[in-house]
């Protein structure tokens, strides 16, 4: 029951975040043809495969996210939602993020890399996708393994499948981290 309430609260926040931008202009000049001039959600979501996460897996996640966002934003045409979520180019995780004693990658280092890639453009939220174990320091515990991390608020998130019991739940963790960024 608690999980259901948290999920409903998260969906509500996503809905409100999408509605709060009104008719503002989003000046995406120079960003390429893949970005809509006025994104229906007020931002564009880029899914970026990292390391051994394949482009095909990222595309499957994109389709699931569009489906779930279509349920949330039922008045937004599917074509507009599809234009707001795209799969970016694959990138390697920097070696500087690797923590050898635990065989994990520091999520904060990955977030910094993703943030710097867009130069702080808040209209694009980049979500890094990996199968590797990621970690952060939390609640006084150094190098704690996590499923995802996000700048709050911000323009970058990272999500890992390493700790997921069911790989088809990746879209839930992705939306969870995305909501932190808004």
What label would you give each PLM region?
Residues 20-22:
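Bacterial signal peptide processing site
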Residues 1-4:
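Positively charged n-region of N-terminal signal peptides that target proteins for export
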Residues 16-18:
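C-terminal motif of bacterial Sec signal peptides marking the signal peptidase cleavage site
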Residues 24-26:
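Low-complexity, intrinsically disordered or signal/transmembrane-proximal segments
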Residues 59, 63-181:
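Metzincin-family zinc-dependent endopeptidase catalytic domain
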Residues 41-56:
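Fold-level signature of zinc-dependent metallopeptidase catalytic domains
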Residues 6-11:
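Sec-dependent N-terminal signal peptides
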